Each structure stands twice: as structure tokens, then as C-alpha cells.
Amino acid sequence: MVVGKVSEFIGSLYYLCVTLLRFKNIMKLKNYLLLLALLLVVGVRAQVPSGNKYPKREFRGAWIQAVNGQFRGIPTERLKQILISQLNSLQEAGINAIIFQVRPEADALYASQYEPWSRFLTGTQGQTPSPMWDPMQFMIEECQKRNMEFHAWINPYRVKTSLKNKLAPEHIYHQHPEWFVTYGDQLYFDPALPESREYICKIVTDIVSRYDVDAIHMDDYFYPYPVNGLDFPDNASFARYGGGFTNKADWRRSNVNVLIKKLHETIRGIKPWVKFGISPFGIYRNQKSDPLGSNTNGLQNYDDLYADVLLWAREGWIDYNIPQVYWEIGHKAADYETLVKWWATHSENRPLFIGQSVPKTVQFADPQNPSINQLPRKMALQRAYQTIGGSCQWYAAAVVENQGRYRDALISEYHKYPALVPVFDFMDDKAPDKVRKMKKVWTE
């Protein structure tokens, strides 16, 4: 639609120039008019989003979550078969990056040196898998076989999604209960405490040091989503650590900022090639809170979760951003098209990908063509902006299950050809050394 309007404008401009030249046969005027036309055409083209139907490089990710119980209590060999089947299906659908949840509740779906095995794996927190295996190491190896990136997904502050859940005796909570706060029916690390930040950095250090991950990934859970009628219980922490702040909201944002910066420095200090990515809630700020915000009316990263995502990107503390734009096109409070355009103009010079909800995409019809779902229009919007380098599918199982023929569409149309992941050249601008003195080695 936009390109069509621009073409009409250029045609009208050309007609005007030709008409004027008929009546003003002056060489100097002719040159001026042709130059003006050229400048206007170039200027307009620079403002128009230019899509690429089959990009050579594009982030095509998928989240594999543990918290929905899809792994819990499944025998080891059977679970390995399920994961291999999922990866094969996702590879066929053109997915080139897997974001795998390894730390849902200060626990582990890997052989952690500090935290207990996750109840989402074995059914009971602290219970060792039998026979013993390491899901993260297994997934890394399987992803590498398929030329997929592996992003280790951790939740930094969350400890209990329900106070009814039991923590293993070796859980850090039992050693330092003073580090934690209860909010609603959940338990969290207190983001204000230096001890909380140091501990989370220690966990990331362990993962990055011992595992060949391509990235550390965090989603939208920073300060918890607001519970109606309850303020987060951090008055004591504010009294102790809030010096220099008169506004508690600014102080809370600062607490998260410090963690994000420390995690960036931690990862860079161990393996500079490992990326650090964030997948925040889909609205940064509404216009009613900030004139620079989006024309939306919903919960906000900045004001409600105290996550200043644009600052993190601007300062170079994160290496990519995947806002969760899970709404449909035409949503009254959070329109997909409005948000994609907003994020595209606020990438802050960091790779930007769009988090897509598979169920929501296939559930709603295209407003301009009710006979089809919204996938074609969403993909066109995503690829229309040069600042958007791909997307990530929520959730992997929905793709594998081919909900609404989503996987079929990826294979036949949108991921018809494989794509390399985008280049993160700001992380390392040095080319690898030339290969020297290669030798043939025969193996049995």
C-alpha cells in the first residue's frame, strides 16, 4: 500500500516536471527541475520500508519453555526423542535459533554447580534425573548438528510461581532468606540487593564458562507484573540502598539497570562472542505516559516492570532485543502494526527481532482479507523495515503442532529457503585468521 502511494507520487511529480518543461523551454530551469525530481525520488525512497521476501540473513528463532510442564517426569530417553523430534520439525520449518529455558525458578535444567534440578524436569525440585543427563548440553549438541544457535534462557529474579511449591533443601533461599521477598503468591530475589545481583552473575558465569552457548537470554520478568492493590514490598531496601533517589520508580529502574550492565560485563569478560539478549513485554511506554511512546494503552516495561529496554540497547548492554508483540493486528489497546512500526523506529542501533505469538496469529483473520489468518500480513510488516532482522516464534511446540497450518506456511513461503543468522559485527570486527597447515586425518 505504501509503495503504491509512493509510485503515484513519483508519477505525478514526473508529469508536473514534463508539463513545466513544455512551457518553459529554458535549459537552466530544465536542469533544476530534473535535479529536484531526482532528489525527491531519492528522498522518498529512503523513507519507504523495503522488504526482502527471502533474506539471506534473518533471525528465525523459537522459544522452548519448561514451565508449561511439557518435560516434567518424562523418562530420559523418551524426552530426548521428543526434543530431537521438535528440533527436526523446527529445522524443516527454517528455524535457525533455539531459545531454551534452563532456569525457570532459580533452579536448573542443566548440571548446575549452585542450584537444584528443576521440578519442571524431574517433577520434584532437587531430584537428580535418572538416568543422569544434562538437558542443556544435550540441546547444545543437537542444535549444533543442525546449524542452529542455542540461547540459554534464564529468569533472573523469580523463585516460586506459587508459594505452595516446595524448595529443595539445597536451594539458596534456605541459606539466605534475607535476599528474598514475597509478592502476591510468588517469591522473588530482591532486585535492590547487591547480593542478589552478585548471585545472578555467578549463575551466568557458570553457564557461560562451562557450556558452549551462543547467547544468554532473559525474557520479560524483571520486577514482577503488578498485583492489584499490592505494592512491591521494598520499603526497607529503599531506606537502605535508595540514597540519591527521591523517586522509588527511578530507583527500581536503576536496580535493574545495574544488573543488566553487570551481566553484559560478566559475559564479555568470559567469552566476548557470546551474545546477551532480552525479550521484553511488547509495550515500552504508552503515549499518555511519554509523548515518545507508542499509541497504545497497556502495561508498560518502563513504568510497571521497571525495565528501561531502550537504555540498555542505547548503552550497548544488550546485543539484541525481541519485544513480545503478541497481540493481533487491530487490537484496540495494543495494535500489532502500531507496535511493530514503533519498535522499528526505536531499535537504538541494536539488532531487533519481533516476538510472534503463533496461537494469536492464526486465531485472528486478516482485517483486509477475512478468509486468511494474519500471518501473511505480519510477515510483510516484519520484513518491511530494515531495522527488523527477523522474528521469534512463541512457542516452539505450536509451530511443531502446525497450529493453523503455521508450519506449512513457513516451509512453503516465508522460510522457503534457509537463512543465516544476522551478523553481530559490533561485537567483534576482526576476521578469523587464515587457515594454515591443514592435514588429512583418517578416522575409523
Describe the predicted segments one by one.
Residues 81-108:
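Catalytic domains of carbohydrate-active enzymes, especially glycoside hydrolases
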Residues 65, 69-77, 157-206, 210, ...:
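Active-site-adjacent "subsite" loops/lids of carbohydrate-active enzymes
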Residues 100, 104-154, 244-270:
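Aromatic-lined substrate-binding rim segments of carbohydrate-active enzymes
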Residues 415-444:
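Pro/Thr/Ser/Gly-rich low-complexity, intrinsically disordered linker/stalk tracts
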Residues 202-203, 210, 215-218, 222-293, ...:
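Active-site neighborhood of glycoside hydrolase catalytic domains
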